[in-house]
Amino acid sequence: MDTASHSLVLLQQLNMQREFGFLCDCTVAIGDVYFKAHRAVLAAFSNYFKMIFIHQTSECIKIQPTDIQPDIFSYLLHIMYTGKGPKQIVDHSRLEEGIRFLHADYLSHIATEMNQVFSPETVQSSNLYGIQISTTQKTVVKQGLEVKEAPSSNSGNRAAVQGDHPQLQLSLAIGLDDGTADQQRACPATQALEEHQKPPVSIKQERCDPESVISQSHPSPSSEVTGPTFTENSVKIHLCHYCGERFDSRSNLRQHLHTHVSGSLPFGVPASILESNDLGEVHPLNENSEALECRRLSSFIVKENEQQPDHTNRGTTEPLQISQVSLISKDTEPVELNCNFSFSRKRKMSCTICGHKFPRKSQLLEHMYTHKGKSYRYNRCQRFGNALAQRFQPYCDSWSDVSLKSSRLSQEHLDLPCALESELTQENVDTILVE
């Protein structure tokens, strides 16, 4: 076998591999047309590809159609693999621009000679030897599909396969030496018509930039998980410590507390709470100390009721309800009205006699009086909590002792709420608002 025939066999085998994308290690993407090729062949004829392959490891080379048109690149690619130009004519100026872009000086004289041999009457076909994606459906076709078709000589079978699969149009070179002029007129014309009618759609590249493709098609699960987690953590519930109502923002809670201060809601709120930094935050309380306070309060009420005689003449004044009293303080706030006090149903105080639970100490205090059938004498001070309850002890003891000795002294103790009020006024309690 001589060298010429050996080289011809090698070129034919390489060209056949290129036709079917077999053993091709490079893809050239020009617009929506993809050409399979071998790096060694491209680098041998084009300095442009040679420099790209030196500095870039990607298997897909993207070229803008404004730099070189797909039909011009297919024309030059056919010359690279066969040493002969296809039987078609292309615009000479566009051909020269494509050769200059690829820096393929060796192909310049061959392409010019081949282009001048054919007369202008020769059919101008696209002669694309690449995979072109043109479809009316919004389907994504992966570039790595292997298209199994008949050999290049059987053009009729190719047209049938292309008709059966309109979503994947494989435009193969028709202008080979073994093809006739009729075959050139049939297939390329129909292909060009379908190309104009069907809009191109982008495809996912399978072999080139696998990491970027995966990141685009499959978003990271961390971004999907952190989205709802961030929104859940960003929502903070603010709790009103006096009525238990919840708010999603600090400003809404502050407006709600203003309604407590103004007296439009039953529970009074110290005005200084509105300036607190930890407004609406819940702090845990010691349950043991809470239970101790409840026991002390219950024992105090039982002891006071055992020592106190019945005073039926004191029932002329109707006791005030809890909802009718609100307190505004400026210096020392009562224990119950501290902004760290958490109004929670889990910490209800139970009655030691009947077991009934109450959310507030004042309600439990009033309830303990109902067991003895007496009115709540300290209704004007029920918002003060255990701190002021301890102050009542000397008054209650002295009142019960004197009432047993003399009815005259018991009559003087009828003004005990007034005395308590004057004492509280001296201790920086500004006003007691009665609705």
UniProtKB/Swiss-Prot annotation:
A zinc finger (C2H2-type) spans 238-260, 349-371. The keyword Glycoprotein does not apply. Expressed mainly in hematopoietic cells and testis. It is found in: Nucleus. Keywords: DNA-binding, Isopeptide bond, Metal-binding, Nucleus, Repeat, Transcription, Transcription regulation, Ubl conjugation, Zinc, Zinc-finger. It comes from the Eukaryota. The keyword NAD does not apply. GO terms for cellular component: nucleoplasm. There is a cross-link at K142, K148, K198, K204, K303, K330, K405 (Glycyl lysine isopeptide (Lys-Gly) (interchain with G-Cter in SUMO2)). Residues 1-107 form the BTB domain. PROSITE patterns: BTB, ZINC_FINGER_C2H2_1, ZINC_FINGER_C2H2_2. Disulfide bonds: none annotated. GO terms for biological process: negative regulation of transcription by RNA polymerase II; regulation of cytokine production; regulation of immune system process. GO terms for molecular function: DNA-binding transcription factor activity; DNA-binding transcription repressor activity, RNA polymerase II-specific; RNA polymerase II cis-regulatory region sequence-specific DNA binding; zinc ion binding. Its main location: nucleus. Pfam families: BTB (PF00651), zf-C2H2 (PF00096). May be involved in transcriptional regulation. This is Zinc finger and BTB domain-containing protein 25.
